[in-house]
Amino acid sequence: MLVYQDLLSGDELLSDSFTYKELENGVLWEVEGKWVTQGPVDVDIGANPSAEGGEDESVDDTAVKVVDIVDTFRLQEQPPFDKKSFVSYIKKYIKNLTAVLEPEKADEFKKGVEGATKFLLSKLKDLQFFVGESMKDDASVAFAYYKDGATNSTFLYFSHGLKEIKC
C-alpha cells in the first residue's frame, strides 16, 4: 500500500486506495471522496422484547455520515479563504514547497502552479479547505468541492506537495 504524506507537515493525506486523475499538467490530483455511514450495526437477533415482557432498550444508535477521505486521514476542515488570503497562502506555499523540492521538481511545479491557482480561484467560493491532523500553518491544503449534480465531494491536492511512502 502507498500512502501520500504532506512534504511540509508529514501528515498522511491520501493513499493509493483512492484513485486520482491528474489536472493542470499533473500539478493537481483530483480524487473523489464518498459518503460513508458510521455508527452502530443494526443487529436483529429475532427476539421481541415487548412480547417477552422486556423493555425496549434505549441505545444511542445514531449513524453519522462522513466523507471517507476526511475520516480515513483525519483531515481537519479550515475556515474558507477569501481571494486575498488565498493568494497570500498560495504564494507562501509555493515558497515553502519549492525550498524542499529537488530543483527539477521545483521548476516543474513553478511552471504549472499558475494554471492550477487560476483553476482553484475559479472555484474558490465553492471550495472547502482541509489540512492534515497536525493542523500546521504551513502545511498543504486539500481542497474539496462538489461537481455539478454530484453527491460526492471531489478533492484536489497539489501533487508536488505529496511524498509517496510504502507501507
UniProtKB/Swiss-Prot annotation:
Primary location group: cytoplasm
Transmembrane segments: none
Top-level taxon of origin: Eukaryota
InterPro entries registered for this protein in UniProt: Mss4-like_sf, Mss4/transl-control_tumour, TCTP, Translation_control_tumour_CS, Translational_control_tumour_p
Entry keyword set: Calcium, Cytoplasm
Key word Protein biosynthesis present: no
GO cellular component term, pick one: cytoplasm
Compartments, record wording: Cytoplasm
Annotated ranges, domain TCTP: 1-167
GO molecular function, one term: calcium ion binding
UniProt similarity note: Belongs to the TCTP family.
Entry function: Involved in calcium binding and microtubule stabilization.
Protein name from the UniProt record: Translationally-controlled tumor protein homolog
Gene name linked to the record: TCTP
